[in-house]
């Protein structure tokens, strides 16, 4: 008698299309599917893969981070490409002239980029301008920037753990005594 093979781990889990039913996103996917197939550029394949991603994997990119990344040597006069949202940052006073391509740009960020003499493209315009992704810099927001990541990692209360505990409130009586001070049991 043969042994049955476990087939539960056979399937490769990855997105082949976006979960969203947004017709405009679907049109972009159609366009970049074509470009990824017909051009030999990795840029189009990466953009296509990112168009499929969930919102948590397409975190917003702040204007300040984009400016910092575009100031690096060799990135002058290049287009910043973000498969996601570009948001404003009030801490930045001077916005340089930028050429940006993004899925969405918040209204304040949009007005500030345009006021500085910059240009904002959509992905279909980018496909016409540089179908192979030449002269572009692909950027993305901080994926681990969400508050929820502070709760992940070594269990809170164990030595050298900086993990944030899920606490009802931040009062004197909550997770402040035992394990936190030597006079109350022990200190981690």
UniProtKB/Swiss-Prot annotation:
The modification Phosphothreonine is found at residue 158. Pfam families: Ribosomal_L18 (PF17135). It is found in: Cytoplasm, Cytosol; Cytoplasm; Rough endoplasmic reticulum. Keywords: Cytoplasm, Endoplasmic reticulum, Isopeptide bond, Phosphoprotein, Ribonucleoprotein, Ribosomal protein, Ubl conjugation. There is a cross-link at residues 119, 164 (Glycyl lysine isopeptide (Lys-Gly) (interchain with G-Cter in SUMO2)). Residues 161-171, 178-188 have a biased composition (Basic residues). InterPro entries: Ribosomal_eL18, Ribosomal_eL18/eL18-A/B/_CS, Ribosomal_uL15/eL18, Ribosomal_uL15/eL18_sf. PANTHER family: 60S RIBOSOMAL PROTEIN L18, LARGE RIBOSOMAL SUBUNIT PROTEIN EL18. This is Large ribosomal subunit protein eL18. The gene is Rpl18.
């Amino acid at each position: 008698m043969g042994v049955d093979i476990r087939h539960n781990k056979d399937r490769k889990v990855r997105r082949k299309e976006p979960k969203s039913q947004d017709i405009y996103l679907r049109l972009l996917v159609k366009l970049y599917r074509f470009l990824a197939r017909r051009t030999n550029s990795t840029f189009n394949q990466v953009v296509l893969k990112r168009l499929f991603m969930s919102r948590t994997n397409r975190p917003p990119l702040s204007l300040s981070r984009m400016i910092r990344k575009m100031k690096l040597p060799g990135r002058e006069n290049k287009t910043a490409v973000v498969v996601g949202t570009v948001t404003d940052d009030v801490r930045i006073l001077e916005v340089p002239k930028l050429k940006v391509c993004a899925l969405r740009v918040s209204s304040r960020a949009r007005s500030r980029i345009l006021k500085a003499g910059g240009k904002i493209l959509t992905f279909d315009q980018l496909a016409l301008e540089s179908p192979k992704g030449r002269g572009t810099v692909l950027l993305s927001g901080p994926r681990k920037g969400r508050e929820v990541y502070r709760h992940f990692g070594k269990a809170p209360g164990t030595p050298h753990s900086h993990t944030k505990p899920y606490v009802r409130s931040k009062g004197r009586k909550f997770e402040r005594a035992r394990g936190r001070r030597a006079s109350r049991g022990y200190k981690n």
